């Protein structure tokens, strides 16, 4: 309504120009000098300021020779000077006021009534800032004793995968938690798989890390394996003891033969002497 009232009070030429601003919709017609003068008068007398578009210029267009032919750009990029004295210095309302003169006056009056507006704006900007995300504290690395490592390694040699009851028993016997035992077993299994693959053997687990069928030994298989290992160790001890006894048996006949070999050359001269003592046969 305000815009229509001001248009009625204006001259007939301006009213006619307002009713039919553009003859055509060509770029040259829109940016012509006549249209430029019309928008300049609107900006000076604040007639329907919402119709005047004033985008914030990204760079200066005055130096470009190709844009000097369009005088409307100077009107669009021009900032209003009518209400510049009403804008409080240092406030955050300047970009809003430069776009809309009517809103500029209302905002200036509101800022004059509330002197603590700057503090409110700063507090709102502080609350809008996102709080920094706190990092999750890193879990400390468990340091195992030598006795615990020996117990874990011995159990791992017998059983590569632990059930929940076995894990609980092992954790209680070594003074550890189930999580510590589980983590150690996971790391140890990874080393074991790498060693198996380096040796040129088939991977003991599936691609997703699950154990293959019959790869987890049962308690009966573990006991049978222990018996076989003990029997193999006892056989090795017997063989080693027999090897140590064999050199003593082989040395005895050699010792007996040595005096006989030495005595043989001694008897030969005696036989010759006896033969020489006999008288020669008569011819």
Curated annotation (Swiss-Prot):
Task: Mark out the compositionally biased spans (Polar residues).
Answer: 122-132
Lineage, top ranks: Eukaryota, Metazoa, Chordata, Craniata, Vertebrata
Originating gene: Barx2
**Which is one Gene Ontology cellular component term of this protein?**
nucleoplasm
Stored CDD domains:
homeodomain
Output this protein's name.
Homeobox protein BarH-like 2
Gene Ontology biological-process annotations: cartilage condensation; myotube differentiation; negative regulation of transcription by RNA polymerase II; positive regulation of transcription by RNA polymerase II; skeletal muscle cell differentiation; transcription by RNA polymerase II
Q: Do the record's keywords include Plastid?
A: no
**Stored SUPFAM superfamilies:** Homeodomain-like (SSF46689)
Functional summary from the UniProt entry: Transcription factor. Binds optimally to the DNA consensus sequence 5'-YYTAATGRTTTTY-3'. May control the expression of neural adhesion molecules such as L1 or Ng-CAM during embryonic development of both the central and peripherical nervous system. May be involved in controlling adhesive processes in keratinizing epithelia.
